A protein has these predicted regions:
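Extended, low-polarity transmembrane helix blocks
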Residues: 1-33, 48-60, 64, 70-140
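Perimembrane loop-to-helix junctions flanking transmembrane segments
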Residues: 36-50
Length: 140
């Protein structure tokens, strides 16, 4: 069973590690797109900072989440990606980018699948190397 899960696990882990990482880096270069255009006017009006500054903060979060997934925090990182993509989708719906919102919701399903496959592989939410062997979320 573990071999079969690996065929699913590794492509998902690499994808959901690299995509947020690269998207986060692109928040500083805008090579892929000008990300500020995707912030809905409703969201922009609630920000206590410029949209550009907000997108830089978003970039940092995406870089950290991508690294977490790539470095073995896959089960927890996958769930963070699910929540992150759901929030992005809500913003995109408010901005009228329905096609992109649907794409991000589909990606959220894939991230959920990654987290569930990691759970099936008996991965902890936080790898033991990060906790010095202590299992902070272990079931009693």
């Amino acid at each position: 069973m573990k071999e079969q899960l690996s065929e699913i696990y590794w492509p998902l882990r690499i994808t959901y590690g690299l995509v947020p990482l690269l998207a986060g880096l692109d928040k500083y270069t805008n090579i892929l797109t000008d990300w500020q255009h995707y912030v809905s006017p409703t969201a922009a009006s609630m920000l206590p900072m410029s949209v550009q500054t907000f997108m830089h903060i978003v970039g940092i979060v995406e870089i950290l989440v991508g690294l977490a997934v790539l470095l073995g925090f896959t089960r927890l990182g996958g769930l963070v990606v699910v929540a992150w993509l759901a929030l992005i989708s809500i913003n995109l719906l408010l901005a009228g980018y329905f096609d992109v919102a649907v794409r991000d919701l589909v990606m959220a399903v894939g991230a959920y699948t990654l987290s569930m496959v990691a759970a099936e592989r008996a991965e902890e939410y936080v790898p033991s190397f990060a906790t010095g062997g202590v299992r902070p979320f272990a079931h009693q």
